[in-house]
């Protein structure tokens, strides 16, 4: 187990860097809606990186009398995977902001559809167990930052947005491994007339591990949105999550 912990901490650290996904989870749109975003990342003394992600929603049905949907984000890496693939969270469709700020805890199930190793799913107890093993703790917040609406212009289109302050503090402190602290601070501009609500977001990510500090600035910008026919077939969940499979067959 001692040899496992550095690998587990590395993978769980990647999850904390994706804490910004919680800004999309509040009051999800109806199944079939989608949106695309460009993410620009800038690190000191390195060229800027550009990536594109797509969010979508598909129906799951009811759980304990409440409507649940799958929030899909793709393509992204998960738990240290070499491959990028769709990552899906099974969430209440009417999830409030408090629930969205606790995205991992709010998910009834998480599915990572690895195209090479195959899909696998995590249940809440799997998330809790893995968090305990690596000493993972995180807090997210999204709060109003300006009582007045702001105009955000993207190309030929202008959006009337509410500005919110985003903060995330994460600690990963497993035995035998140096503690890592990850701090995300930024601003989100939201317009609730579009799917997922987010028009633009800008934030800084700082990772502190011992005397090593890494920083990156990111800008996420809406590039498109719409509605399509949601898939009718059941989602392929694959095998249940296993630490051994994660470490030796990922």
Regions of interest found by a model, annotated:
Residues 20-106, 113-114, 118-250:
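Acidic, serine/threonine-rich low-complexity disordered tracts
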Residues 4-16:
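Bacterial N-terminal signal peptides
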